Amino acid sequence: MMDKETAKHRAEELRRTIDQYSYEYYTLDEPSVPDSEYDRLMQELIAIEEEHPELRTPDSPTQRVGGAVLESFQKVQHGTPMLSLGNAFNDDDLRDFDRRVRQAVGDGVAYNVELKIDGLAVSLRYEDGYFVRGATRGDGTTGEDITENLKTIRNIPLKMKRNLSIEVRGEAYMPKQSFEALNEERLKHEEEPFANPRNAAAGSLRQLDPKIAAKRNLDIFVYSIAELDEMGVETQSQGLDFLDELGFKTNQERKKCATIDEVIEMIEELQAKRADLPYEIDGIVIKVDSLDQQEELGYTAKSPRWAIAYKFPAEEVVTKLLDIELNVGRTGVITPTAVLEPVKVAGTTVSRASLHNEDLIKEKDIRILDKVVVKKAGDIIPEVVNVLIEQRTGEEKEFNMPTGCPECESELVRIEGEVALRCINPECPAQIREGLIHFVSRNAMNIDGLGERVITQLFREHLVRNVADLYKLTKEQVIRLERMGEKSTDNLISSIQKSKENSLERLLFGLGIRFIGSKAAKTLAMHFESLENLKQVTEEELLAVDEIGEKMADAVITYFRKEEMLELLNELEELGVNTLYKGPKKVKAEDSDSYFAGKTIVLTGKLEELSRNEAKAQIEALGGKLTGSVSKKTDLLIAGEAAGSKLTKAQELNIEVWNEAQLLGELKK
């Protein structure tokens, strides 16, 4: 068991590493490491945060859904978030999941077991039975519009068998045979082959020319409808049958299991079939079958509590460690990275792995030119498991961390209680550059077209030294950069100007205040409403805000007491950057005179005038509390079409029931 201080610094390192790997995987489609390493690091971080809940931060990768939208396609907002799943790695993890489920909903639980297809998660929107829009998962809330490419997949019906307006979720993939044929063709034309079928599928669906996607023989399995409970369907297994009836292709390697023991048996059966399947799978998905029980279990910020993904055991290979490189992050932390002799692990070429810190290198006695064991459990991140000391030849070289920053040569320091070495020079080019990249990122100021490549050029040409300089850029300066034409320059200048209108929480997150992630930034912006108020805030006022702890409060106070930070913020204001919160304000029940104020409300069935999320937001803005299941504590059920079992239960408990017209009437008051 780690002491709190060690755990704190390990958690910080894990968050940084996981965020970087998430960016490589979800944004660039160029994962540098396999799933196994990513999963291992995530499990380690989850364990630390469970052991020390006070170390859990709002911006931790365990709290969010990771991934940003590329610039090549239009952005699409998902009606219902496309969340990721928690992971199980062994039978004990599955039994723990089962225990949590039964503690929440009782013993009458059945599970639906399905294959986890290794492809690209997509959302298909149908209006009156017609396919109108397809999108990638993206960051779970916002994806990319790839409608024209998805239309080339023959198993996606352009017209359903019923005139429904629904959002269908599925996994687009490339069959093994198509993948092999594609790579043979690429090699014939002296093009680089794809590392695995998933990368090939993702790359195909992100082609701007749909004709390219059409040639690549992609396929799809669908697995859910976002509005399933509005279709009069009561279980996940019925939902899959319903999708079959509508003309979609679902995976038939599935089974409804009455107990977790049956689930484990089914997993063993499916795992034995893995090599013979005509497509790649990277695990098995286990879902609570009852939709009512799913609603009762609900969600964390990152994943549903009613489903889990069983991940296959790790694969290990031996390769040579060629060098150790050092990277400087935006907070000055120096992270060593292993440069490996490229090696294939489960279909992916691995050439780099994070070594986290100097202590880990010493603990494992890792030397340059060592033969090392690299582990991969899935497809994202690699880990150097251990060194093959018995294979040393004498040419290996010990690695020693430098005393100076690899970027600016300033003296490196180890802050008391921290594992990492830091560069504390505020003028360090690497820190400034990384800070600029963070400022323009998806969850911060979200400036389209201003990615790492352009930021690096702007910095190298001395056109920007801080975030305020971004708002001083001219068309003449930008168009001279590499690969920047007239149109891309105009679009970039327009995006920069548009970002001035962002709500305060985006600016706060973009400033990179330590411990303040996107969620904490939203909380602060909502509570204090303006940057001016935050400049004058006291520690007592900060600690009075829900979800703001001592570390966060101290970081905010420290930031707003620095003269150079205040000068930067004043400059941003003078340049026209908005410093006010523009979002909806939380309403306390006692401050609302609405009928909904203080009431516990359940929504069920399909609403015609509003989406479920719109209705929920408006009810909560009037002081109502939304829950997923009907109980004696429920004050009101609002029933749309095909309300199903929730309506029956509400009537049995004599709970007040409204229709959509009554809801709209109250909202208009």
Swiss-Prot record:
Tell me its EC number(s), please.
6.5.1.2
The name this protein goes by in its record: DNA ligase
Cofactor(s) of this protein:
Mg(2+); Mn(2+)
UniProt-listed PANTHER family: CHROMOSOME TRANSMISSION FIDELITY FACTOR 18 (PTHR23389), DNA LIGASE (PTHR23389:SF9)
Q: Do you know which InterPro entries this protein is assigned to? A: BRCT_dom, BRCT_dom_sf, DisA/LigA_HHH, DNA_ligase, DNA_ligase_AS, DNA_ligase_CS, DNAligase_adenylation, DNAligase_N
Q: Does the keyword Metal-binding apply?
A: yes
Q: Which SUPFAM superfamilies does the protein's record reference? A: BRCT domain, DNA ligase/mRNA capping enzyme, catalytic domain, Nucleic acid-binding proteins, RuvA domain 2-like
HAMAP family from the xrefs?
A: DNA_ligase_A
UniProt keyword list: DNA damage, DNA repair, DNA replication, Ligase, Magnesium, Manganese, Metal-binding, NAD, Zinc
The entry marks the following residues as binding Zn(2+), namely 405, 408, 423, 428
- The active-site annotation reads 116
Pinpoint the BRCT domain residues.
591-669
> Pfam families, from UniProt?
BRCT, DNA_ligase_aden, DNA_ligase_OB, DNA_ligase_ZBD, HHH_2, HHH_5, Nlig-Ia
The gene is ligA
Which example biological process does GO assign this protein?
Answer: DNA replication
- Give a short account of what the protein does: DNA ligase that catalyzes the formation of phosphodiester linkages between 5'-phosphoryl and 3'-hydroxyl groups in double-stranded DNA using NAD as a coenzyme and as the energy source for the reaction. It is essential for DNA replication and repair of damaged DNA.
